[in-house]
Amino acid sequence: MAFSRGPVFLLLLLYLLWGSDTSLIRLNENGYEDIIIAIDPAVPEDTTIIEHIKGMVTKASTYLFEATEKRFFFKNVSILIPESWKDSPQYRRPKQESYKHADIKVAPPTVEGRDEPYTRQFTQCEEKAEYIHFTPDFVLGRKQDEYGDSGKVLVHEWAHLRWGVFDEYNEDQPFYSASSKKIEATRCSTGITGTNRVYACQGGSCAMRRCRTNSTTKLYEKDCQFFPDKVQSEKASIMFMQSIDSVTEFCKKENHNREAPTLHNKKCNYRSTWEVISTSEDFNSSTPMETSPSPPFFSLLRISERIMCLVLDVSGSMTSYDRLNRMNQAAKYFLSQIIENRSWVGMVHFSSQATIVHELIQINSDIERNQLLQTLPTSANGGTSICSGIKAAFQVFKNGEYQTDGTEILLLSDGEDSTAKDCIDEVKDSGSIVHFIALGPLADLAVTNMSILTGGNHKLATDEAQNNGLIDAFGALASENADITQKSLQLESKGAILNNSLWLNDTVVIDSTLGRDTFFLVTWSKQAPAIYLRDPKGTQTTNFTMDSASKMAYLSIPGTAQVGVWTYNLEAKENSEILTITVTSRAANSSVPPITVNAKVNTDTNTFPSPMIVYAEVLQGYTPIIGARVTATIESNSGKTEELVLLDNGAGADAFKDDGVYSRFFTAYSVNGRYSLKVRADGGRNSARRSLRHPSSRAAYIPGWVVDGEIQGNPPRPETTEATQPVLENFSRTASGGAFVVSNVPSGPLPDLYPPNQITDLQATLDGEEISLTWTAPGDDYDVGRVQQYIIRTSKNIIELRDNFNNSPRVDTTNLTPKEANSEETFAFKPENITEENATYIFIAIESVDKSSLSSGPSNIAQVALFTPQAEPDPDESPSSSGVSVATIVLSVLGALVLVCIIVGTTICILKNKRSSSAAITKF
């Protein structure tokens, strides 16, 4: 039965439209509330970190208030403290705060020795980022010389996080040819003054020299750096170098530097940072304050053991599609392998009414796990009352003498319940976190709102058992606050429908970062299959434990499993047999973080025809893994699956190339309702490696300052090159990305409503008299297929091209045949009507058009300078420009003085000689 769509539902729907942003931040009367700063479990205990966090945020709040013209400040902040740190009377238990929802993470650096503060940002302009990453040394103030005051750095990163702006410097293009025909440092605003120099240190000594010009680029050489003057008067911009004392503002339209090749210009279409911030929802829902705000309020929350209640549906519909048995298989997997030791777990069954079948018990060994396994349901009947089950879970917590704050409810249901919306407010106010697993196509949508409102997970498992969705969903519910080295990670999840004597064969890789508690799980629907498992040395393992009643077999590898390729072969013994296999393992060494994959979509709810964006992040610790092979499987609630190859190429849906985030558009909607996401990642063909590049969206490193005309350099930061990146051993991972809901999908064939994706990586270079262009090909439908044609236009004015693309001069592209999506495109043309006298810039943009005449819109704008810019004059050489240098003037003055002295001296001598001659004659 469908529930009525009253005011409560509409309010919740509006909340959902915020997207899949995991942050719990709210803006309330100009103040940001519910900010979470989490200290990583890998950080050794040091309570001074907490005090430094408080000081940093307090200073940042004042700075933010002034920088935003008295609009925003930090109102209250929760600091999450690791469970491994000693308890204190001032620490409280978290409610819905968790590491998953952290806005700022204090964690080890991405690469040892590099403490650069950055924001994990893999979305587009104006879109919120993931989190800010500070290292302990940075928070403790040990990197102030390199990055400046930590409070000002926090405001720089907050702008990335909250408003989706980007940096206004560019270390890949630190200099550019300005319209003044001079070489300028990439910055905003141009009012920031400084000196360009090469600063090199070796063997404890450092030397400095002038920058030379590169003969190819006509710009300064690679090692040239811009050293800002310590004393400045310019106030902008925070997104360039917030460490400058005078800088207190974001660049505005009036002082924005559109010429500079900054990432912000490229991503935000040459708008200033303040223009972007001014269009944000935060800005539009606030007005400047008349008084100064109070300092931030801090809550200290220490992670503690999990308190969870399983709330399992035993209504009559659970007898369909083998749902009851499949739920029990997945629950056994969760209770035996996923839930952590020291957790408190209880269990409730519900249909028309709810029954407490097990009070809270702390898991310390297999004894407690087995006690819980004995209480799994064996029969199902009756209706569905979800609120009854949730209220029974609250009673379980109360019976265990726990408040509901921070407790977790794992709710599984397959049915609709018109009364489910009645307890939404109670659930939200409880402080409990609801994780919802929707089983089948009819599970109630109101409960989806519960999970999102409480910060829980939302999963979908269809009735297509071969897709293994139910086991994947339970397996994804490990603690969000546990150390990653203690979590059970999924290496394999696969299934198939097979006839008698047919096989499910494949391999799974156990890499050196894993191997502890390795677990193989096989399930079937009719009769136990023949199971063959061989380790990397070829030794066969046959000692699986058979659980015929639950139709599952499992094997735990003692100690640390062998590194390498494990081979499995499963032989079906019945026709139309459904077999699945799941493999999990934990980190082999607590000091070496394992490779992980995390998956998500850009929004929890969507309306046709808006596309979804699928993301998969592959990391080792905080270090991105690039060059991996990543695929996503999207399953509708009817069981239909679509597979996408995710890309890290910086084109289409992917915002940044080689950042360890693999992305793709998804538009292949088939039905209304829920869809689930599952991602698989492996090492590819010996191509995966750790990225040692500096992360994007970070505070600028200060190479030094110009003080009283002298450069005072900082120690050069640690650098690495592409050549030093090691190729990784092969690995395999799978991960559940949760569920999303799509509405308004029409029945029947879908019309062509999807244009090509916008080109975002257009680059232009001047090659003799020709301009060469490169870009990544879009597709007929976003990043799939092939476009019909490209339209290339140019202009001498960047804003004219941006705002009036269709009326700008068009380049002849008769001989340009589009390639398949995600291919590299190249094209060269000779610009017309350009003379040496008026040569400045040419700006170029591309629009792609598909067979239905749908266009992508103009690309990012590339530019080419048609002149050789002037470098800073060298005092050792004659200047090439007109005018007289200071040295020339000085030499001229000295020469004139010498000449005057010679003339005066000669005159005196002549006069003396005349006097001598006259005296002799008179005397005579």
From Swiss-Prot:
Active-site positions on this chain: E157
Any GO BP: chloride transport
Localization of this protein: Cell membrane; Apical cell membrane; Secreted
Domain (VWFA): residue spans on this chain: 307-477
Top EC group: hydrolase
Transmembrane segment boundaries: 884-904
GO molecular function: chloride channel activity; intracellularly calcium-gated chloride channel activity; ligand-gated monoatomic ion channel activity; metal ion binding; metallopeptidase activity
InterPro entries on file: CLCA_chordata, CLCA_N, CLCR, Ig-like_fold, VWF_A, vWFA_dom_sf
Enzyme Commission no: 3.4.-.-
UniProt family annotation: Belongs to the CLCR family.
Domain notes: The metalloprotease region is responsible for autoproteolytic processing. It can also cross-cleave other CLCA substrates.
Functional note: May be involved in mediating calcium-activated chloride conductance.
Designated name of the protein: Calcium-activated chloride channel regulator 4A
Organism: Mus musculus
